[in-house]
Curated annotation (Swiss-Prot):
Protein name, as recorded: Proline-serine-threonine phosphatase-interacting protein 1
UniProt domain SH3: residue ranges: 359-416
Residues modified to Phosphoserine: S318
Function of the molecule: Involved in regulation of the actin cytoskeleton. May regulate WAS actin-bundling activity. Bridges the interaction between ABL1 and PTPN18 leading to ABL1 dephosphorylation. May play a role as a scaffold protein between PTPN12 and WAS and allow PTPN12 to dephosphorylate WAS. Has the potential to physically couple CD2 and CD2AP to WAS. Acts downstream of CD2 and CD2AP to recruit WAS to the T-cell:APC contact site so as to promote the actin polymerization required for synapse induction during T-cell activation. Down-regulates CD2-stimulated adhesion through the coupling of PTPN12 to CD2.
Native species: Homo sapiens (Human)
Entries under Gene3D superfamilies matching the protein: Arfaptin homology (AH) domain/BAR domain (1.20.1270.60), SH3 Domains (2.30.30.40)
Outcome of substituting W232A: Abolishes binding to MEFV. Cytoplasmic filaments are finer with fewer branches
Membrane topology recorded in Swiss-Prot or TrEMBL: Peripheral membrane protein
Organ and tissue specificity: Highly expressed in the peripheral blood leukocytes, granulocytes and monocytes, namely in T-cells and natural killer cells, and in spleen. Weakly expressed in the thymus, small intestine, lung and placenta.
């Protein structure tokens, strides 16, 4: 026998900012709530029909004559009228029983709604907290990397000036290099702190997600059990009330006997599973741990730790013009000048990152606000509709809105 599948193992999403699995489960519970209402409406209308039918039978029996008949036929006719009245009364009683079942289902549905709302509130809180801290961590990372680049540039400038510059220029350059280094150190501290906070919230969200999945599976189990039993009881009530229709209701019972709650849950999970693993933690990336590949085999030139540069303007999909990328693509190596042999310079390879063209253009919606940082970027407001022209692998997408083109972060968009 296969082990019972669990919601908590099958509704994850690798995208750190997406909550697809939770949304699928929540929709399942909402669909189940609608099913409860449909069952309630069925019982309500059947109770009304049984009540009308019972009252009409009682009225027919009481108005029937037969007083002119005598002896055994009179007794038989009187018995028929009495039994017809009894049948009518039993149908009226059945209507009352169906209304009791209806009230029980309504109370069950409301209890499940209250329980679901509690878990929804908790999940909304942790999801918003996770997304907020993720955005903060990414901004801290961006600032940290920029400060590191500034510190490297200032250090290189100081080394050049110290070789043949004036004393004041050397001191000024040295002070600037020291300030840039301090700024980079502070940015690194903020970045580490942001990652630590994000990991704490991520762990809390993951635990809440598991707990919510377990609660939702229990609710689904209870709902299926209650509805299955309600169908069973309703079928038995109608079967006992109308023996002549027993064959039809027997078919219902045979069908209900083949109903398996476990099989229903397994089938749903297999059809709608969104993944078996939660998103991986966001790692801390040290700026100076990146691999630098020298493009020259000259033994006189060694790689300099911390001399890494990022030429974002030469990459397709980054917020720079493609003409700059084309003109810079031919420059593959940077070599030190002969008169600077006493300095240490590292040749840096530049790879051209190809973008994924979105052909034909597709419409996307902005999820968050974004303020352009460069002239070739576009401002975004949550809810804006845009056409994606090019999807850059570095995360910057070329979009068009109202005749204007520019770059925006791809993670801020969702496909319509």
């Amino acid at each position: 026998m296969m082990p019972q599948l669990q919601f908590k193992d099958a509704f994850w999403c690798r995208d750190f900012t997406a909550h697809t699995g939770y949304e699928v489960l929540l929709q399942r519970l909402l669909d189940g709530r609608k099913m409860c209402k449909d069952m309630e409406e069925l019982l309500r209308q059947r109770a009304q029909a049984e009540e009308r039918y019972g009252k009409e039978l009682v009225q027919i029996a009481r108005k029937a004559g037969g007083q002119t008949e005598i002896n055994s036929l009179r007794a038989s006719f009187d018995s028929l009228k009495q039994q017809m009245e009894n049948v009518g009364s039993s149908h009226i009683q059945l209507a009352l029983t169906l209304r009791e079942e209806l009230r029980s289902l309504e109370e069950f549905r409301e209890r499940q709604k209250e329980q679901r709302k509690k878990y929804e509130a908790v999940m909304d809180r942790v999801q918003k907290s996770k997304l907020s801290l993720y955005k903060k961590a990414m901004e801290s990372k961006k600032t940290y990397e920029q400060k590191c680049r500034d510190a490297d540039d200032a250090e290189q400038a100081f080394e050049r000036i110290s070789a043949n510059g004036h004393q004041k220029q050397v001191e000024k350059s040295q002070n600037k290099a020291r300030q840039c280094k301090d700024s980079a150190t502070e940015a690194e501290r903020v970045y580490r702190q942001s990652i630590a906070q994000l990991e704490k919230v991520r762990a809390e969200w993951e635990q809440e997600h598991r707990t919510t999945c377990e609660a939702f599976q229990l609710q689904e189990f209870d709902r299926l059990t209650i509805l299955r039993n309600a169908l069973w009881v309703h079928s038995n009530q109608l079967s006992m009330q109308c023996v002549k229709d027993d064959e039809l209701y027997e078919e219902v019972r045979l069908t209900l006997e083949g109903c398996s709650i476990d099989a229903d849950i397994d089938s749903f999970i297999q059809a709608k599973s969104t993944g078996t693993e939660p998103p991986a933690p966001v790692p801390y990336q040290n700026y100076y741990d990146r691999e630098v590949t020298p493009l020259t085999s000259s033994p006189g030139i060694q790689p300099s730790c911390g001399m890494i540069k990022r030429f974002s303007g030469l990459l397709h999909g980054s917020p720079k013009t493609t003409s700059l990328a084309a003109s810079a693509a031919s420059t593959e190596t940077l070599t030190p000048t002969p008169e600077r042999n006493e300095g240490v310079y590292t040749a840096i390879a530049v790879q051209e990152i190809q973008g994924n063209p979105a052909s034909p253009a597709q419409e996307y919606r902005a999820l968050y606000d974004y303020t352009a940082q460069n002239p070739d970027e576009l401002d975004l407001s949550a809810g804006d509709i845009l056409e994606v022209i090019l999807e850059g692998e570095d995360g910057w997408w070329t979009v068009e809105r109202n005749g204007q083109r520019g770059f925006v972060p791809g993670s801020y968009l969702e496909k319509l």
